[in-house]
């Protein structure tokens, strides 16, 4: 299996399966002399960690990260810093329940990657989905924590802005509310609604989708390159690679199709601090290159495919059958996609910053 690496100069390779001994990543291309400890990474992992509320999978994983390489104590200050060599990060799996998946050993779960993995490779890890499990995203979050250290002047935040058909009231957006509810929702009133709404879905054994918005502030103008190195192209690819993501938009995205040229153009004025854009329909990127405005992206997460209703499928022999999914699953996988999205955007921005410095100094 290839394609486990993304990035050009800041490169991340993830490894491991949902029910294997461990998962992790190797980060290559991180500049030297950047302070980095396990505590710097653990905070981000704790935000993604499962089992923290009744609205996520009840799999109990501590997700304690270990730095295996790429750091050492600075010879003068004694502070632990990066050395410029590959940084290997490992997270042990401690709460696997593979017996929950014995029924699907020979059956394909509708909506999952079971059929496609076996069609491609002739074998699949049915225990929790193997590499296709959202468990893999913990490795991305660990890598994203390293990436944040490469771009300390940028603030990268994400929020759940819609669950099912119910969107937040953007007039009530408050970043401080993100940490006050289990949904990473910036609207206090809507978070209270989501609690009752998702409880109802969870108790029926069903699931629901979500929309996540990511905003990166402090991104300097000039990141990205024309044609095949566009910043928005790489962001879209990074976000689309997250489990269950089915659509990505930058800035106003698909809504711009309904706008006129006058409405959509981000007009510019001068100021003592440089150009000032009067709007940000483009989401901070024009021609594939950052404008200096906040970079804005949104993506849609489909409902978790593992639900408690019997469904029609086929077995490995091609016979029609029914399947009832067991195991521990998220009723809304979009919730834990929030810190994953931040991590992916951080990795892309770190990669583009290093590429930009290499090209133009």
UniProtKB/Swiss-Prot annotation:
Q: What are the GO BP annotations of this UniProt entry? A: amino acid biosynthetic process; aromatic amino acid family biosynthetic process; chorismate biosynthetic process
Q: Which Pfam families match?
A: Chorismate_synt
Give EC number(s), comma-separated: 4.2.3.5
Entry keywords, A to Z? Amino-acid biosynthesis, Aromatic amino acid biosynthesis, FAD, Flavoprotein, FMN, Lyase, NADP
CDD domains found in the cross-reference section:
Chorismate_synthase
Instruction: Quote the cellular component terms of the Gene Ontology held in the record.
Output: cytosol
| Cofactors | FMNH2
Q: How is the cofactor bound?
A: Reduced FMN (FMNH(2)).
The reaction(s) this protein catalyses: 5-O-(1-carboxyvinyl)-3-phosphoshikimate = chorismate + phosphate
Main function: This reaction introduces a second double bond into the aromatic ring system.
Q: What is this protein called?
A: Chorismate synthase
């Amino acid at each position: 299996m290839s394609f486990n690496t993304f990035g050009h100069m800041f490169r991340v390779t993830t490894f491991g399966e949902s029910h294997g001994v461990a998962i992790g990543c190797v980060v290559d291309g991180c500049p030297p002399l950047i302070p980095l400890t396990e505590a710097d990474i653990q905070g981000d992992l704790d935000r993604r960690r499962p089992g923290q509320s009744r609205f996520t999978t009840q799999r109990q994983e501590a997700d304690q990260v270990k730095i295996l390489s790429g750091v050492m104590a600075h010879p003068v200050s004694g502070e632990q810093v990066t050395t410029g060599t590959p940084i290997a990060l490992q997270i042990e799996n401690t709460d696997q329940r593979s017996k929950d998946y014995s029924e699907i050993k020979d059956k394909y779960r509708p909506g999952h990657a079971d059929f496609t993995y076996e069609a491609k490779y002739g074998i699949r890890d049915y225990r929790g989905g193997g590499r296709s499990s959202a468990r893999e995203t913990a490795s991305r979050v660990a890598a994203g924590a390293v990436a944040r250290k490469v771009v300390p002047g940028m603030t990268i935040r994400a929020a759940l802005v819609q669950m099912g058909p119910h969107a937040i009231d953007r007039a009530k957006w408050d970043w401080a509310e993100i940490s006050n509810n289990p949904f990473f929702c910036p609207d206090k009133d809507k978070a209270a609604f989501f609690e009752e709404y998702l409880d109802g879905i969870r108790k029926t054994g069903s699931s629901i989708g979500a929309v996540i918005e990511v905003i990166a502030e402090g991104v300097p103008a000039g990141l990205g390159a024309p044609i095949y190195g566009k910043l928005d192209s790489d962001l879209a690819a990074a976000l689309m690679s997250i489990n269950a993501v089915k659509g990505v938009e930058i800035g106003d995205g698909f809504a711009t199709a309904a706008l006129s040229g006058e409405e959509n153009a981000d007009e510019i004025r001068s100021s003592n601090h440089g150009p000032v854009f009067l709007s940000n329909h483009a989401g901070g990127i024009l021609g594939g290159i950052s404008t200096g405005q906040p970079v804005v992206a949104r993506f849609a997460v489909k409902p978790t495919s593992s639900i408690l209703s019997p469904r029609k499928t086929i077995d490995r022999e091609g016979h029609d059958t029914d399947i009832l999914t067991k195991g521990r699953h998220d009723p809304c996988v979009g919730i834990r996609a929030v810190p994953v999205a931040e991590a992916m955007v951080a990795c892309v921005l770190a990669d583009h910053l290093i590429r930009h410095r290499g090209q133009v100094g």
